[in-house]
A protein has these predicted regions:
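Conserved pre-motif I regulatory segment
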Residues: 140-182
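A contiguous, basic/glycine-rich beta-loop/short-helix subdomain that forms a polymer-engagement track
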Residues: 292-312, 317, 328-335, 427-546, ...
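Signature of the SF2 helicase/ATPase Hel1-core->accessory helical subdomain module
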Residues: 220, 224, 297-423, 502-516, ...
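Walker A/P-loop
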Residues: 174-196
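A substrate-engagement module of RecA-like helicase motors
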Residues: 145-148, 152, 205-317, 325, ...
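Conserved RecA-like P-loop NTPase helicase motor core
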Residues: 532, 543-554, 604-716
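Mg2+/Mn2+-dependent nuclease catalytic core
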Residues: 21-123
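Conserved helicase motor "Helicase C" RecA-like lobe of SF1/SF2 P-loop NTPases
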Residues: 579-603
Length: 752
């Protein structure tokens, strides 16, 4: 609409004028740039700066609420023009032109004359306020650096391996390179990577630490670690970023309407935020989700944007992976940078990043998604958007096949054209006064944007297909087979990067998926052994029962007997992991029917609070044995917060390999084409990671004791024996439920 207004403004109206000036305060030089919507050369020789604003609100109301900062923007442009004229132009008109979206004749003009002296005072006040912010940040940096001069490790003693991890982290930062760390759960990895990186703030190797994790429990642990360092005297600012939809304080149905016309927390945001941040930073150093919500509610501002603005002023920022790696929602400063940034990157639970990155760089659009939005759009104003959606639905309906999947070499051009038409009509709808549209449209708009942002024509690491149901096309899919180049490219933009996890085995597999090289496996890898005594654990492998899908019903009684013989020998808490929800239910019903144990099962789609309540059931030394029935690879497979010494044992039923299917077979073919073992890359290794993560729930502290039982005939195969050698070289093989009982009885008797 801006262009339409500019084009209709006459020949003396010069649109989109770039402006620039330099301001030297003596110790700071600012290069100030902007682009005026328009400059008008009036008949009398005077100039007018025009700033165009559009809205769907009542123009008078919109003007009254926003004129101060709208006019302020135009006044800065006017000041630059007069300043650059070197005194030849003494005054200028400043105009703010308000237009109703989609109605060029419905307008409100606010115009005022200003002299250079008036504008110069205005600009100087703003500039000096901005410089004060810069200096405040500089003062904080000086205070921070001074405070870490004598910063001690925040705990009385180092655990085994911690000093090695600190030294390795320090080396990676000093070399400005990438490192990979495999260190067991319970060693205290978080403090060992943060401590040396924080100590290096003073050396100028980093100006900000990005700490990435996909788990809320690990986010809390990182905040707790920073808090411990602050209590040791470090003047650090830290903020944890929560997903926009999670932290949004609007009611359901309005969470995606992020504009000042509809959201009370977006209204007047930028006129409030500076004072809010100054006040917040004067009161505390560390901000979690609850802190941010409290500040946002008190000041009626957007909590998500507040967290991002606090991050600008923070030394340590804790994010989900998508904030750095997602091509759609990633931080623009990182995503758009071609140069190394003065930041460092810490990636926790790094074994999860490759699969998450594949999700970020893949997309799927379903016919049903478009159909649902079509039915929810109402009113005459939505007619053109609905028509665009009908065209897309028709595109699906015209494609027919007796196959389930049609392989493509690229996304069809006609489909891309239809998607762009959908985007255009959606934008037109949003500009209309009082336009109403459901959250489902906002979600679909985001999905289409993400789809079009991906490579649309054949790339070696991409696969394209259309799926069919009952002979009709029902979805189109862009599938990223390998995201390692994107992980490598983005992590290259940081001054130094450390990937760390309790599970990076097999090492060659994970380092390659994280964008590393063969050389990295030798020179940039730290593999720390477990600091916990092996005598405190019993690791058994029952490799007799077949857990292949076709054999599961037959082997179920044998599997359940082995589990029973293990859990009956010591009163306590046990987690039992199964290959599917259906299989888990069968096991749960059998054990529940015995009446001997307290049986608690994982439910489908549990909320965060329901998960916490589930875990709270497992207290140390319960009166009756508690059995937790869980799905292998599910929400309780890793990154959970259990009470100390909560578990006495874990049983893992199956090797955890994903179901044989088209997507995984494509991965298999892709890696086979690169000369690697395709089956291992697509099936064995992802499944084995689930197994090891689940097994790691037991021994988490020096004085923990427990039993681990793996059940699946495939654990007896040579490839799994080799994988288990890297993690559990002390395991024993058992051939019957009776042997499980005897070994378990002996273990607990020796440790009673």
């Amino acid at each position: 609409m801006h262009k339409k207004i500019q084009d209709s403004s006459g020949g003396n109206y010069i649109p989109e004028v770039p402006l620039e000036t330099t301001f030297d305060t003596g110790d700071i030089v600012l290069d100030i740039q902007g682009r005026a919507d328009g400059i008008i050369h009036n008949i009398d020789g005077s100039l007018t700066v025009d700033e165009i604003k559009t809205t769907v609100e009542d123009l008078e109301k919109f003007k009254d609420e926003n004129i101060v900062w709208h006019q302020g923007q135009a006044k800065m442009y006017a000041w630059m023009i007069l300043r650059n004229s070197n005194g030849h132009t003494k005054s200028i008109k400043v105009r703010v032109s308000y237009y109703k979206q989609g109605h060029i004749k419905d307008k409100l003009i606010v115009e005022e004359d200003f002299t250079f002296d008036e504008l110069d005072r205005f600009a100087n006040d703003l500039i000096h306020e901005f410089i004060a912010r810069l200096k405040e940040k500089g003062q904080h940096n000086l205070s921070r650096n001074k405070s870490i001069d004598f910063l001690e490790f925040p705990y009385k003693e180092y655990r085994p391996g911690q000093q090695d991890l600190i030294a390795f982290s320090d080396r990676i930062l000093l070399e400005e390179s990438k490192g990979y760390v495999e260190a067991p759960t319970g060693i205290g990895k978080t403090v060992c990577v943060l401590y040396p990186f924080i100590k290096n703030f003073k050396e100028g190797k980093t100006s900000k630490i990005f700490y990435l994790t996909s788990k809320n429990s690990i986010k809390r642990q990182a905040l707790k670690t920073v808090d411990a360092l602050v209590k040791e005297g470090a003047d650090l600012r830290c903020v944890a970023i929560t997903a926009k939809e999670t932290i949004c304080m609007n009611d359901e149905g309005f969470k995606k309407h992020c504009n000042p016309d509809e959201c009370p927390f977006a209204k007047d945001y930028y006129s409030k935020i500076y004072k809010v941040i100054r006040q917040a930073l004067s009161e505390k150093n560390i901000f979690d989700e609850d802190d941010i919500k409290e500040i946002a509610m008190k000041n009626t501002i957007c909590p998500f944007q507040l967290s991002l603005d606090l991050a600008v002023n923070s030394d340590i920022c804790i994010y989900d992976y998508n904030y750095v790696f997602d091509p759609v929602v990633g931080n623009p400063e990182i995503m758009d940078s071609n140069l190394p940034l003065p930041y460092t990157l810490l990636v926790d639970e790094a074994h999860n990043l490759p699969s998450r990155a594949i999700e970020m760089y893949s997309a799927r659009l379903d016919r049903e998604f478009f159909m649902n939005v079509y039915t929810e759009l109402t009113g005459r104003k939505t007619s053109k958007l609905k028509s665009a959606i009908v065209d897309i639905i028709s595109w699906f309906d015209m494609r027919k096949s007796d196959k389930d999947i049609e392989i493509l070499t690229e996304v069809p051009d006609d489909f891309i054209t239809l998607l762009k038409g959908f985007q255009e009509e959606g934008l037109n709808l949003e500009k209309k006064p009082d336009a109403k549209y459901p959250d489902s449209y906002v979600s679909l708009k985001s999905a289409v944007k993400g789809f079009l942002k991906l490579p649309l024509k054949g790339k070696e690491n991409y696969s394209y297909d259309i799926t069919y149901y009952d002979g009709k096309a029902d979805a189109i899919h862009i599938f990223c087979l390998d995201a390692s180049e994107y992980i490598r490219d983005i992590s290259d933009r940081f001054n130094a990067t450390l990937f760390f996890s309790a599970t990076l085995s097999p090492v060659d597999y994970y380092i390659s998926l994280l964008g590393g090289t063969k050389d990295d496996e030798v020179n940039k890898l730290l593999n720390l052994p477990s600091p916990f005594e092996r005598r405190n654990r019993l690791v058994m492998v029952d490799s007799i029962p077949s857990l292949r899908y076709a054999d599961r019903n037959i082997s179920l009684p044998r599997v359940l007997n082995s589990i029973y013989q293990m859990v009956r020998e010591k009163n306590g808490n046990y987690f039992l992991y199964f290959p599917s929800y259906e299989y888990m239910l069968m096991a749960y019903e059998r054990f529940e029917g015995l009446g001997e144990f307290v049986c608690i099962k994982q439910e489908r789609n549990m909320t965060p609070s329901e998960r916490i309540r589930f875990l709270d059931e497992f207290e140390e030394d319960p009166l009756r044995t508690h059995l937790g029935f869980l799905v292998l690879g599910g929400v309780f497979g890793e990154g959970i917060e259990l009470k100390p010494h909560a578990l006495n044992g874990v049983v893992i039923v199956s090797t955890g390999i994903p179901g044989i299917g088209y997507d995984n077979d494509r991965l298999k073919q892709y890696y086979a084409g690169k000369g690697l073992n395709g089956f291992d890359y697509a099936y064995t290794y992802p499944g084995f990671n689930k197994v090891i993560q689940a097994a790691g729930r037991v021994i988490r502290n020096v004085d923990d004791k427990g039993v681990i039982l793996f059940i699946d005939s495939r654990f007896g195969h040579s490839n799994y024996r080799k994988l288990l050698d890297e993690v559990y070289p002390d395991r024993i093989y058992v051939s019957s439920p009776q042997e499980v009982r005897e070994e378990t009885m002996k273990f607990w008797k020796e440790r009673s």
